[in-house]
Amino acid sequence: MVSLLRTLFHAATGRSPKLVCNSELWSRGVDELGRRTEDTHESGAFLLGELKGAVRKIRQFLFYDDVDPNCFANGIVEFDGSKFGLVWDKCRTMKMSVIADIHVHPRGFAQSPSDRQNPMIAEIGHIALILPDYARQSRMPGAIGVYEYLGSRQWRDWSGAGDRAFHVGWWPR
């Protein structure tokens, strides 16, 4: 009940998070990311959804290796840029867009130099999430990496903002 009241208060006062996902979808998607790591390599997904005002609502996980089966061949995310056409086709078919991305690290949730230099979607405002520990333990805002792309390979770190930046659960808009 406290969570619902806090959500309604934030919505009513115009303090919307940048990104939201319902609990069931988040749990299923994160479980699948953890499974796909096989505890040996990274995994990741494009987060498809829609922009509602200033809030990005996640509606579906599109796993990197479903689009590019070889993207984890070296243990880290190395997505073949020629496969982006398949991503855009899926977005058109589903009437959604890539509103964020997520990938899994073996340990912490800090961005690696490669993460900072190579955004999956190099668009200002794009959100990149990083789950630590192969998605086995920490999986909720406040314990995961939340990064907003500012352009020119610069990022804003929202990781410490908890659900003020990324909210998992019901959201009214």
Indicate residue ranges for each PLM-predicted region.
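Conserved beta-strand-loop surface patch within small alpha/beta domains used
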Residues: 1-98, 107-173
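Residue-level "edge-of-site" marker
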Residues: 104
